[in-house]
Amino acid sequence: MRNYKKLEFSFGDNELVGQAQTRRRLNKIIKSDRISHAYLFSGPKGVGKKAFAMAFAELLNGVSNMTSLGEQKFSKKSSWFTHPDIHLFLPMPSSFKLNDLKERLELLKNDPYDIVDFSLRPSLSDDDSSKNLRAFYPIDYFRDEIKPAARLKPNEGEKTIIIISNIEQMRERSANAFLKLLEEPSDDLIFILTTDNQEALLPTIISRCQLIRMSPLKTPEIRDALIQKDGYEKEDAQYLARISGGNYSLTKFFDIENLKAIRDDVVSFLRVAYQLDTVQITDMAANWNKNQTREGQIAILNTMEVFIHDLLTYRETGNSRWITNFDQIEAIEKFVDNIPEARLTEMISTIHELRPNLQQYVQAKIIFTVLGIRFFYLMRDKDPEIAPDDNWKHIPAYISN
């Protein structure tokens, strides 16, 4: 049995972005030489859960790749991807095959922060060619692929390691079957699970795992990664990091020119919201619903939040130095002059409140319609007529237009 206490390393020093607290904790876990049979990495999308899970699996089986081990490595494999005892699974739409999964795993081999989730990136050849798909772990996927992998004895490494991304997407039968595996672990098997939505998991699954919480990445961390790892210019990296919402994976694939076009639409949306032009509000909401993928719709919300934050900053300081959209200073000045009493903080809170609904597949056209109508009141320093708990009452405004 490998004695991990003797290893000298800095977890993820070659590849991982931010998450200093999580890195320190994983360092301590491995150096303690008390390895649990199951770990659950929990946190928002795009903060590096899969990347950390892969780096953890590599380190446990002695692979020097994402973490530098030098002469201490005890595997000849170059990464988790080629190691026979490390198996990674993603939830899949029913229409996709295992070959589609292998393509995506190869992308992760080259970039652990690549977007490979079927739900976010249905097509690898053309990111805009299809809408978002729902992806799950149905019982046949679990029975035919995951369970047999978990029964394998280590071939080369210390442990057989099963990484299951987005474990919350297990169907009920799959989750119950998986729980049986989790309840009766073998000594040479480790599960590493990730989730974007811990609340959706069976409590019995959570209780049998060591929980590793991960936070949204900080703006400077994303900015530096975009410059150092992805080759962005400093100005573009700063802008992208500010609108990232702490999601590095999504941000690194943004098209800067497309984002600026989105920003122009956001400014127009705020103008028609101020006028309560319901026809324009619902038309824009329908257009975003139809022509933007889920990540594009999230980018719109992030862009909107940053622009409103710029309004707040400029109103309070009168200094353009501290704003993100500095090239939009004329538009910002006009907004601040025309809506001096706007409840900008409440507008940002409204976005925070509605963003999870978008991530849970509520139709974007409804969410943006609700935003437009509520913004009308908040920009006039008034209480919205429809309470936040009754957002469904905005739906007739959409249907009637």
Mark where each language-model region is:
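Conserved catalytic/switch belt of AAA+ P-loop NTPases
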Residues: 151, 176-190
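Conserved adenine-binding aromatic site and its adjacent loop/helix in ATP-hydrolyzing domains
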Residues: 148, 180, 207
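Residues immediately C-terminal
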Residues: 169, 184, 200
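Structural recognition of the conserved hydrophobic beta-strand(s) that form the central parallel beta-sheet
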Residues: 161-165, 178, 189-195
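Clamp-loader machinery-focused feature within the broader ASCE/P-loop NTPase space
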Residues: 2-173
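Charged, glycine-rich active-site and insertion segments that engage polyanionic ligands
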Residues: 1-80, 187-190, 196-303, 307-401
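Glycine-rich, phosphate-binding/catalytic loops in enzymes
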Residues: 58, 105, 179-181, 210-211
